Amino acid sequence: LVVLATTVVSFRSNRASDGRKIAVNKRRRELVVPPGKLRECCGRVGPMCPKCMCPPRRC
């Protein structure tokens, strides 16, 4: 009985860690942006860069 209870607890913790791994991998995929979607704006490069709002001499 004691071994069975320990096994059940370990399965639950493994499932929880799997859920965390899936969430981390999902976030990682969101952070990876194809090169064509990156824009340079005022010296910064990013996926969600708005239109450049700097003075014309800086852009």
Swiss-Prot record:
Full protein name: Conotoxin Bu26
Highest taxon of the lineage: Eukaryota
UniProt tissue specificity: Expressed by the venom duct.
Propeptide residue interval(s): 11-37
Post-translational modification: Contains 3 disulfide bonds. They are not indicated here, since framework IV presents two different connectivities (I-V, II-III, IV-VI and I-III, II-V, IV-VI).
Notes concerning its domains: The cysteine framework is IV (CC-C-C-C-C).
Family according to the record: Belongs to the conotoxin A superfamily.
GO CC field: extracellular region
The keyword Disulfide bond is annotated on this UniProt entry: yes
InterPro entries: Conotoxin_a-typ
Signal peptide per UniProt: 1-10
Keyword annotations of the record: Disulfide bond, Ion channel impairing toxin, Neurotoxin, Secreted, Signal, Toxin
Location of this chain's protein in the cell: Secreted
GO molecular function: acetylcholine receptor inhibitor activity; ion channel regulator activity; toxin activity
Pfam families assigned to the protein according to its UniProt record, in alphabetical order: Toxin_8 (PF07365)
